[in-house]
Amino acid sequence: MKEKITGIVLSTVRHSDRHNVTGVYTRERGRMAFLTPAGASRQSRQTAACFQPLSVVEAQVSVNPTRELHIPSAVARAEVWRTIYYEPAKMTVAMFLSEFLGRLLHDSPAEPSLWDFIMQSIKLLDTIDDEASIANFHITFLIGLMRLTGIFPDLSAYSEGMEFDMKSGRMALPFSLQGGVRGMRIDARRTSFLPKLVRISYANCHRFRFNGRERSEILDDILRYYGCHFPGCDRLKSLDILKEIFA
């Protein structure tokens, strides 16, 4: 029996001459893989328009838990974004977030709170027009997502000169005094940004005035932190383009 599925598009890769595999995070079933048409036919072009990064689609799907690939039918947009695919900065953010979420949610079950956060975030990205908010949007998203993935940093013991231990998610004495694994630490200079950074939200992100170097370093550290807990999240093809756009 077919189910009505609503999903956020995360990735599309070529499967054969006739088909793509589209990764979708669905409200009802969590991560799913759809087999979608490829090529130059009218149907393929119409389908491709629905399956852009962070598109939200509705489809009828015969769900079989033993199958990796599902064939959707009656595919339609559940939301129509006004600006994301027409403004280069927003499109770059969408490509980055879809790639990141594709790594993070590669086998995730349905989680209503996570779905709602992602969905509301995309809606906000489509409506904001303040340059500072757009430039800081991906950082704000990644910080907010930490609460839902269980890795929000514990900075309660912070004092000047301390480092951040990414493995434990807590403050630590400098590596030179305490030892440990250097690659799992954020140094004292960059750690000094954290108490301010974790207070960032969609409501106040326009007030955070980072220069290009600061924004790049902050993003690198955030992705390294995610990578410590969710392997692969720190190796993204879209990262360099994102940094260039917001340099």
Predicted ranges, named:
Residues M1-V21, Y25-A247:
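Non-catalytic alpha-helical scaffolds and adjoining flexible linkers that form interface surfaces
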